[in-house]
Amino acid sequence: MNFGKPAAGGNPLDRWHDWKHTLSGAPASLRFIFAGIHRTVTLPFMPAFALTIFTGAFLLFQVQPLVGKYILPWFGGGPGVWTTCMLFFQLLLLGGYAYAHAVSRYLKPRTQAILHVVLLAAALASLPITPNDAWKPAAGDDPAWRILSLLTASLGLPYLVLSATGPLLQAWFRRTSPGTSPYRLYALSNVGSLLALMSYPFYFETNFTRFAQAQFWSWGLGFYAACCGFCAWRIWKNADEVTPSATAAASPAATADIPNPTAYQRALWICLPAVASTLLLAATNKMCLDVASIPFLWVLPLALYLLSFIISFDSPRWYSRFWFTLLLSAALIGVCLALFAGADMPIVQQVVIYSAALWVGSMICHGELYRLKPHPAHLTAFYLFIAAGGALGGLFVALVAPAIFNNYYELHLSLALLVALLLVVSAQDHAALSPRRWRVLAALLAVGAVYGADQAVTTVIAWLRTTAPALFSTVEYFWANTQHAGLHWPVWLAAGLLAALVALLRRRAQPLDGHRTTCGLLGLGLGGLIVVLGVQMRETSRGSLLTARNFYGVLSVQEYGQEDPSTHYRLLLHGRITHGIQFVAPERARTLTSYFGSRSGLGLALRTFPRQQNQRIGLLGLGVGTVAAYGKTGDYLRIYEIDPAVKQLAEKPFSYLATSDAQIELVMGDGRLSLEREPPQDFDFLIMDAFSSDAVPAHLLTREAFAIYLRHLKPDGAIIVNISNRYLDLRPVVENAARAIGFMSYTIECEDGSDDEEQGAWWLYGSSFVVLSQNRAFMENYALRNAASPAPATLNTIPLWTDDYTSMFRVLK
């Protein structure tokens, strides 16, 4: 594609048309973005406002992953860090919109310009935005409030000023160009936000260090301040020269004829963005929980969310309630399948399903929001309500949900609320669907309702099986033998017949009848969805002995095999991943389980180490405390754990810590930060087993992290890293770090059920450990060397991870 060069000189509009002609061969997505920019900047007085709004939006959203990546290692590296960051950004966005609304309503134009320039100068004086090390959390600090305080101190004023850019400059533009809709500027700001988000993981993160990124951002803020200052100067200079039409538009006589928004409209201005915001953060949590909390999995959902804003606010023709209701039905089926499949579904499929559901849901919320947009006289109030709704969604996911739920139910709730809101707006809109469309919609919703009934009946039968097995044995047998992939053919045969019957109805409904039928079936579909999601929530908590949720995630203790003491066991789940197993019977309570069997890399390293007495062992990540079973009399085991709920559960109902022969000391806080602050511990072994669900926090695998580990290790000691992961191949990352600190390394893999004393030990999982040491006598031990896996051909193709560079893309399996 040749972009060519616009002709020098001439009318600016001619040059824009030259660019438009040159882009005729560009991809459709690029032409769509260009078309929106072209329609915007060719309006009178628009270029200066457009450039300022675009730059402000770009900076506003690029700083989010940048600052998030800075503080991620300080707070455990889990998805809760990004959720809390998003809450901060939404609250500051609300503050910026409130400021813009207040000054545009109560201050004269010249006063507005002066005040905003003063705030711009103060924002520049507060640079740089990089957080100070003094903000690193100490043990016992509340992580959510610490993050909010940290971000307020380092980023608060610049972000507040940037947040006010869109609504304030649109209000200024409305004064200079009356009669021209300012809503295209809102779409342009979202284009800038989208480009900022997508450029970060694919360009800035991979090509520049964090320090360089922060420097570029500061320079960008200076450029933005200059552009914004120019716009303020124009408003100040022309305050007494406003066009007659602008004066008339702002006069009380003119605004008296403008209808005020109704309470119903204002309620939807809050509820629609609140549901979209909740859905955004819930989908982000789902995707980050099982892989890693990384910028790409932050920006992908946020980019889709913004894309829905761009499309919806560009033109009403992009959103059709009928077609997006159909798309939502398909997306909900996919989400239900993903929720029931759990961790067994490949991560790529999960990301696609949750991303599609997020985009469709956001399109519905923002499309309906655009339909409810007020007269431009109420523009800043409209944006203020949108920001308030977004902040409410963020507050709910970041602070309220962890306090009232014991599991991740935000996605379930947001989907149900989305369908309920769609039902509300459909009930208020009496524009009838055509008979063909409502029959198609009715058929699809009927299938959804039957699916809900299917899941409900399945749950009832499962419950009755335990309460009245004799009475329902025949029904249970029939139901089990008609099952296929979790669905039952009699139910789905009935669903197909019902759908065909509804679709083939020949009666031409009257407009009101068609409207009522559609709303009724939409309500039926909502009921079916609630049943399905309720069943899935029940399945999630089935068998749970204890459940705890906090900033770091959801922990669940489940109990199985009570009928046989020899197989009676408990397991700990973090999210959907098992983090430890222990038999309940006292004679089996010290059995090595899960990833830590005697044939695992950890077990082999501990058995073959030359010094077997009075070992000093450091452990990052407690789990249920299985490693403590290796402790012998005279050993010292120092365990670092960031999550207080893990400590409580490891002490009760699990008992590995209580029954260990070693002396055990627990240190609460992030393992890396704790080791940074402590004097050298002289460990014989330092074991890294810190997981967030199935993800390893990346900040524990960088060159700088291993340099810290080395300081706490005896000269002949060893580092053992558990890299067992279903989605990421972390072997090259750890072996690169070993070379960087001058250590030898072996990767030892173990299959499910491998045990020295018993074959087919179901309580032992397949595992992968990397053993690192500069102790040649230890590393050249035949048993250890013989168990090592050969190095793959791609081992040397992964760059060394540092605090300034990590890339999960390169290590995806």
Q: Locations of the language-model features?
A:
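Alpha-helical transmembrane segments of multi-pass membrane proteins
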Residues: I37-N796, D803-K813
